[in-house]
């Protein structure tokens, strides 16, 4: 839930107007809107490059995933991995745009560990995959943008660990 929504709901629950501190928080959130949009655009515009770099890094760490019997051995499995990369990158952009990790959790993390275990996908490998995705994504951002984006990737890896 965004800062604005949180403030409004909290104030309404307490039957009051937002405090000056809460309004200051909203002001700070709105002031970062342009950079959050810039980050989301950069990640979306560079999705193919980011996914390609991340998968190369992951499969150099875990070459066994691409060998016979590995989780990305077949073309279908490999393409599913790439699809998941794009999906997680998109989740990160949702969180960045909202300025909150809640969309990431609500849309993509509830039950994710159980799902990967049920599918026989090694969860530690998924954690490595998200770390590779983070490295590749932060590489297309400037230092301020990377500082803002990094915690959203970390949130996903922590949830999977």
Curated annotation (Swiss-Prot):
Chain positions with N4-methylasparagine modification: 71
InterPro entries xref list: Globin-like_sf, Phycobilisome_asu/bsu, Phycobilisome_asu/bsu_sf
A Pfam family assignment: Phycobilisome
Subcellular location: Cellular thylakoid membrane
Any one cellular-component term (Gene Ontology): phycobilisome
CDD domains per the UniProt record, alphabetical: APC_alpha (cd12125)
Modification(s) after translation: Contains one covalently linked bilin chromophore. The chromophore is added by phycocyanobilin lyase CpcUS.
Binding, (2R,3E)-phycocyanobilin: 81
Family: Belongs to the phycobiliprotein family.
Self-association state and partner proteins as the record states: Heterodimer of an alpha-B and a beta chain forming AP-B.
The protein's role, per its UniProt record: A variant alpha-allophycocyanin (AP) which forms a complex with beta-AP with maximum absorption at approximately 670 nanometers. It is an important phycobilisome terminal emitter involved in energy transfer to photosystem I.
Name of the molecule in the record: Allophycocyanin subunit alpha-B
